[in-house]
A protein has these predicted regions:
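Extracytoplasmic small-molecule ligand-binding "clamshell" domains
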Residues: 27-98, 106, 231, 242, ...
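Periplasmic-binding protein-like
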Residues: 38, 115-123, 196-233, 237, ...
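Extended ligand-binding regions for polar small-molecule ligands
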Residues: 55-68, 127-128, 135, 140-141, ...
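Short helix-initiation/N-cap motifs at beta->coil->alpha
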Residues: 58, 74-84, 129, 164-178
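A conserved helix-loop-strand patch within extracytoplasmic ligand-binding domains
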Residues: 70, 99, 112-158
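Alpha-to-beta junction loops
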Residues: 70-71, 88-96, 140-141, 177-190, ...
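Ligand-binding clefts/hinges and TM-proximal coupling segments of bilobed small-molecule sensing domains
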Residues: 71, 149-164, 202-205, 236-260
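A ligand-binding cleft/hinge motif common to bilobed small-molecule-binding domains
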Residues: 81, 97-106, 153-156, 182-213
Length: 260
């Protein structure tokens, strides 16, 4: 068998060295810039008393950091700007109530899941109509948060008079309570939490509605950042194994049975 040429050996050594340096660099990073939104409780929200972002995914980011040996610097970002901020390098990873979708995986990479949920249908508190799905809302004006998978869901149906988009769930619910829209679609656990906390008044979740967009909540990294993805996945496995993740979900009133 012919031995490897000197040129090939140098190229192979250089590639191996580059991979080792990349992995070592990821392991040496002591702090990450983490994108989170100010309006998505219980996943992420702005706590008025401390003037800081709090919630499930903030606790997850901190727990993952502790398990992985780094700190998480939370950066407040609008939901629609999370992925652009990540891909442009302003953020190192995203920790928010963002569902993994086929379209998003074309642009970014997702970690192992930390939770799973689907959409909820928000209606006026005095609306006693039957809503097993969205078809009863044909020719109505409905609302949805910009940048979410639920906009695509509504748009593909093509049955609505108008689809209005909002920067936050709070703005959307306010328009619903004022009668400006007939109904709205949003993150079921987010809306349920806000209603339990009496932060959303005059609205309710349609009790008979069955979600069709059930997805996984994950941490999100850039496509070219395999080393950070591996570091996060190892840390997620650790907080699942030792019960930390289950404790976080329980703290915020989420059903641990929905956890993948």
């Amino acid at each position: 068998m012919n031995s490897l040429s000197p040129l090939f050996r140098r190229l192979a050594f250089g590639l191996c060295a580059a991979m080792c340096i990349s992995a070592a660099h990821a392991e040496s990073v002591s702090s990450y810039k983490v994108g989170a939104t100010a309006s998505g409780s219980p996943f992420t929200f702005l706590d008025i008393k401390s003037n800081s972002i709090q919630g499930v995914m903030v606790d997850v980011a901190e727990a993952v950091g502790k398990a992985g040996g780094f700190s998480s610097q939370i950066e407040q970002t609008n939901f629609a700007a999370l992925i652009p901020s990540l891909t442009s390098g302003k953020l190192d990873f995203i920790s928010a109530g963002m569902l993994k979708t086929e379209e998003r995986t074309k642009v970014v990479d997702f970690s192992a899941p930390v939770y799973a949920y689907g959409e909820g249908l928000i209606i006026s508190a005095d609306d006693n109509g039957a809503y097993p799905d969205l078809t009863p809302l044909k020719d109505q004006v409905v609302g949805v948060q910009a940048g979410t998978i639920f906009y695509d869901q509504l748009n593909k149906l093509g049955i609505f008079k108008e689809i209005r988009t909002y920067d936050s769930i709070g703005e959307m619910v306010r328009d619903l309570s004022l009668g400006r829209i007939k109904a709205a679609v949003g993150d079921q656990p987010v809306v349920a939490y806000q209603i339990r906390q009496k932060l959303f008044k005059g609205v309710k979740l349609a009790p008979d509605y069955q979600p069709t967009n059930v997805g996984e909540v994950c941490l999100v990294v850039r496509k070219d950042d395999a080393a950070t993805l591996e570091r996060l996945n190892n840390a997620i496995a650790s907080i699942k194994a030792d019960g930390t993740l289950a404790s976080i979900l329980k703290k915020w009133g989420l059903d641990s049975q929905a956890r993948p």
